[in-house]
Amino acid sequence: MVNKQLKKKAQEIGNVPTHYELEIEDYDQKQKKYGQAYFIWKDPKDPEKHITVELRNDGALLTFSTTVHSETDKKLPDAELKLTALQFAAANHPGTFMNFHFQGKEERGQHIRFVYTKMELGLPIPNSGFLIDMTRSGQIVHFLYYGEGHKAEVPTEFVAKEKVVSHYLNTMSFELMYDVIDGEQEPRLVYEPILPGYSYPADVDEIVPDQHIADERIENTAPLPPLQNKEEVDIFALLGFTSDMQKVSERDFGEQIGSTWRRGAAPERKDLSIGSYFETRNKNTIKMKTDKRTGKLKAALSFMDWRNNLQCSTEECQEIALQFLYALYPRAAEFFRVNPVRIDERGRVRNHFSVWYKGVPLRFGAARIIVNPETGLIDAFMAPDIEPEQLEAINHRPDVSAEEAKEAFLAAFDVKLEWQPDFTAGSDQHCKLVYKPVYPSYIDAHIRKKKRL
C-alpha cells in the first residue's frame, strides 16, 4: 500500500474523530516485507485521549490502542466479549486468525484480556497469535498481533525428565538476600536459589550450555572506597542543572512525582516522525523523579546537549559517581558495595553500586549512575527500590537454616516443557523445546513453612 492508503486505513480502524490531530505519522519501509506505518492521533482539548494504530506495509493491523473510552455502565458476559474479540481479529487477519488457540483470559483492572497463540504439542509458541484488551462493555482498547511466530521443530527423541531435574539440583546453590516481596513496604530476609540461567534442551541431540553460575550482584563486588574530594557537592549541578532551566511538565507516579526541566525553547518539529517527536520532547531537558514524602531524588535522565570538550578518565568518572552517591546517601559506605564499571556503546562510564547490609545483599537493589566523560556530568541515575536504612530494622540472622531452606525448595522444584526462541547462530525464526525450571523464587529465612511463596 502507498502511504496515503495506509493512513486512510489506520483512520478507519481507529475510528478517529475528525477533530483529532495527527501527532505521529512514521513510515519504516526499508524492508519491503516487514515495513511498518505508525500513527498516533490525539484530542487537542485533552492530551490524555489518544489513538494509536500500527500497520504492516501491506495494510495488515499490528497494533491498535485507544485511551478514549465510551461512557456506559453496560457489562457483557465473557462469552459475548470473547466473540467480539474473535470478530475483530477475523476482520483484520481473515487468513490467519483461525490458526490460533485460546490461551486464557486475564483480569487487568477495568479491562479483560483475551490471549490466543499458536500451539505445538499442546504448548504455546512464543511470540505468536494475538491479544485483545476490552472493557466490560465490549469496547476494544488494545490489540497486539504477533502472527505465526517462530517455526517449532519437534525433537525426535526427548531427554528424560529425571535427568534434567538431577542436573539442576546438582548445580544449584542458595544465597541469603534481602528482598521486597509482592510489593510490600518492608524487605524480608530470604534464601534465593541460584540456578543456571538457561533452560535445558529437550532434544537429546542438543548441547547443554557449559555456563558458569554467577551472580554479578555478589561476585566481584568491593567495599565502597572513601571520597578523595570531601567538599560538599550540588547533586543538581552534577546533573547539569542550571538556574535558567524551566519546569515544563509534571506527572504523578503514585509515591513519586516526575518533572521535566528544559533549558531554552523547545525545537521546532521537523516532521511527524517518531524521531522528530522525541527530539522535540527531549532535547535540552532533564527529567527527574522525586519521592513525594521525602523530596529525595529517585531517578534522573539528562538529554542536555553540552559541548565541554572534556575527556575525563574512567577513574575521574568513578569519583564523580561516588561524589553523587555520597551526597545522596551520606552513610553510603555502610550500605553499598561497588561493582566493576562498564563502558557503554557511547563511551559513557556505567557505575553500579549494589546495596548490602551486614554482609547480605539486597536482591534487586542498586544505585546506577552513568557519567559522560566528555562533559564530566551525570547522564542518568536510578536509585535503589528502597531506602537502604530500612535494612537496619531487619534481623539479619536467619531462623531457618540453609538445609531447611533447601528441603523446602526441593519439595516444590519441578521442570516443565516449554517452547522458547532459539537464539543460536543459524536458527533465525526458529524455536526449540526446553525443560524450564519451576520453583519458588525465595524461601523466607524467618518463617518455617514448606510451601511455595
UniProtKB/Swiss-Prot annotation:
Please give the family membership noted in the entry.
To B.subtilis YcdB.
- Which gene holds the coding sequence for this protein? ycdC
Q: What is this protein called?
A: Uncharacterized protein YcdC
Q: Which domain of life is it from?
A: Bacteria
Alphabetical list of InterPro entries matching this protein: YcdB/YcdC_rep_domain (IPR032599)
